[in-house]
Amino acid sequence: MSHRRDYGSDAVHVRITHDPPPENCFPNSGDSSVWATEDDYSRVWAINSDGAESPSKKTRSSSSSEIGKSFFKTKLCFKFRAGTCPYSASSCHFAHSAEELRLPPPPPPNWQETVTEASRNRESFAVSLGPRGNVAQTLKSPNWKTRICNKWQTTGYCPFGSHCHFAHGPSELHTFGGGLVEGECKIGTSATLDTKQRGQVDTVTSLVSPGVSSQRTSSAVTQKPNGVRTQRKWKGPDKISRVYGDWIDDIE
């Protein structure tokens, strides 16, 4: 900044220049904490651009503007030192000399409680995410490990490991809704599940005619009061195949 006096009048012309100031203008230039950083400039420019925003955004950013005003001239302008600051000393948010520096405002009375609460919220958020195992434990469905894993049973290997939705052996079998299967129930359930893996119903379509035994068989599963399910075969067509055809043989 330079001054030029017009000797024909009392007017003084002020011309703003971007020449770097002398080094002795900043006595504490070696202390990096007194200089504004790029984050400080970005924050100030964001606050100054609130004038072009909608009224709803202005309301949300009013608190940020108040905070920005409280830190006015609390740091030295690094861009002014480099000769690249586009603002004058009165309009720049940062100090252009040591005389303009102001002490930063004291922290609010409850700043320690605020920091502690923020830290507690971050910890609770991290715990809520948790590792994969905890999430799987929380999100278990009622059908969790109520059936034997087909891949594990046929190949002896399952890529899901302990996170598999199905049981890897009778020892991991659970009842519907949770809880391990105990005693005879485990044996009966395991046998039934093995039958299901191989195919519970085996149906062969055949032509039923008088004098020819039907090969059609089906499986029926019954459950006893103690919880053990058993399987028995029923040859239904053999019993009813001649019900409607016997009278023809009698006539002949």
Curated annotation (Swiss-Prot):
InterPro entries: ZFP36-like, Znf_CCCH, Znf_CCCH_sf. The keyword Cell cycle does not apply. Keywords: DNA-binding, Metal-binding, Repeat, Zinc, Zinc-finger. The keyword Metal-binding applies. Coiled coil: none annotated. Residues 1-31 are annotated as: Disordered. It comes from the Eukaryota. A zinc finger (C3H1-type) spans 71-99, 143-171. One of its GO terms (molecular function) is zinc ion binding. Gene3D superfamilies: Zinc finger, CCCH-type (4.10.1000.10). GO terms for biological process: regulation of DNA-templated transcription. Residues 1-21 have a biased composition (Basic and acidic residues). This is Zinc finger CCCH domain-containing protein 28. The lineage of its organism: Eukaryota, Viridiplantae, Streptophyta, Embryophyta, Tracheophyta.
